[in-house]
């Protein structure tokens, strides 16, 4: 497809960046509350909860989901925290938000009987995954993340699309073990595979797969109850999200439990649903991009219409998807003329 010049988008700059060293980095009339309206409103609330600033007051009760022997998920602490606690020590995948991390760590100690966290994975740089870093770094915890995540945590992020700023972490609270290529860790009789899913939600997202338990921690690459958050401030985009979900599908079988960044543990069928939605919306937006449509014109065209009852309010998702695809037209099959 050939690209016609898009009409100007009246929205403010989205704060797009090219990598961790980029300096910019990072009312309608009331209507009856029918089921569709309720779900759209719920979806908006879920997205908003993912984008709360680091100083937000959150007192959601913590809940626990058992996943097997010495393996459980804590929810309600800003983001899902996966806890594996063999005799060798406690291993966490994500650490909750700064506001709730003390509550999360206290519950971990009470549930496991262990005082020290041996290993912490940061699945990406966002505040609700890295809230425990500043505490755990003082006790010698190994903090593992992709190198891009460490780089983002070392700069002040100005996320213009959210109209929020996120301060850098102190140097000692940043990941102390980083990687680029897929890795495997043996710990407590379990084998954990972890690797990057490029530009799926940010440019540093990783999965952590516990082979024996058959539990796949997907974090915010997988979305429940809302359209995926494409963090354009750190290079997330719709094709990256689709590629990430497809990578997770290849790792899964019918019995795999999928741990998202927020929301309930999912069956593998959820990956199929997210991939199908992303594929359809991406194709529709590519056609509109080739016709030179703006972000608002794409929103008005309702490319997500049949999915909204499940995924919620699509406006921010479409707007961020537009920002991503407009920077990568050739990867969308659109040639510039």
Cite the ranges covered by each PLM segment:
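N-terminal secretory signal peptides and thylakoid transit peptides that target proteins
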Residues: 12, 16, 21-45
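Zn-dependent metallo-beta-lactamase
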Residues: 32-88
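Conserved beta-strand hairpin/beta-sheet module of binuclear metal-dependent hydrolase folds
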Residues: 65-110, 115, 206-220
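Divalent metal-coordination and catalytic microenvironments
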Residues: 70, 84, 94, 124, ...
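Metallo-beta-lactamase
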Residues: 89-90, 97-99, 184, 191-280, ...
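Active-site HxH/HxHxD metal-binding segment of metal-dependent hydrolases
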Residues: 110-184, 203
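Short, charged, surface-exposed loops that flank catalytic or proteolytic processing sites
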Residues: 286-297
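C-terminal regulatory/interaction regions
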Residues: 295-337
């Amino acid at each position: 497809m050939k690209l016609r010049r898009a009409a100007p988008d009246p929205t403010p700059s989205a704060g797009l960046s090219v990598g961790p060293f980029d300096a910019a980095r990072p009312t309608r009339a009331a209507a009856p509350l029918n089921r569709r309206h309720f779900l759209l409103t719920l979806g908006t609330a879920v997205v908003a909860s993912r984008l709360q600033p680091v100083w937000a007051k959150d007192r959601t009760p913590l809940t626990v989901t058992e996943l097997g022997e010495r393996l459980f998920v804590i929810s309600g602490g800003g983001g899902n925290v996966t806890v594996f606690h063999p005799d060798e020590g406690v291993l966490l995948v994500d650490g909750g938000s700064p506001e709730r991390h003390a509550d999360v760590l206290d519950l971990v100690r009470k549930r496991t009987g262990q005082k020290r966290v041996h290993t912490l994975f940061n699945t990406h740089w966002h505040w609700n995954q890295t809230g425990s870093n500043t505490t755990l770094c003082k006790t010698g915890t190994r903090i593992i993340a992709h190198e891009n995540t460490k780089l983002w945590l070392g700069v002040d992020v100005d996320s213009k699309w959210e109209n929020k700023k996120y301060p850098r972490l102190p140097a000692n609270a940043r990941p102390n073990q980083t990687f680029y290529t897929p890795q495997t860790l043996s710990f407590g009789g379990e084998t954990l595979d972890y690797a990057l899913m490029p530009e799926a939600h940010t440019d540093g997202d990783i999965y952590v797969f516990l082979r024996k338990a058959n539990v796949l921690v997907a974090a915010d690459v997988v979305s429940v109850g809302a359209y995926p958050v494409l963090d354009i401030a750190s290079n997330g985009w719709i094709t990256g999200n689709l590629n990430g979900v497809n990578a997770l599908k290849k790792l899964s079988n019918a019995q795999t439990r999928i741990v998202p960044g927020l929301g309930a543990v999912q069956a593998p069928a959820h990956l199929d649903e997210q991939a199908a939605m992303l594929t359809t919306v991406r194709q529709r937006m590519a056609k509109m991009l080739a016709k030179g449509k703006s972000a608002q014109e794409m929103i008005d065209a309702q490319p997500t219409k049949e999915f909204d009852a499940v995924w919620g309010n699509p406006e921010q998702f479409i707007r961020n998807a537009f920002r991503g695809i407009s920077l990568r037209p050739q990867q969308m099959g659109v040639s510039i003329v």
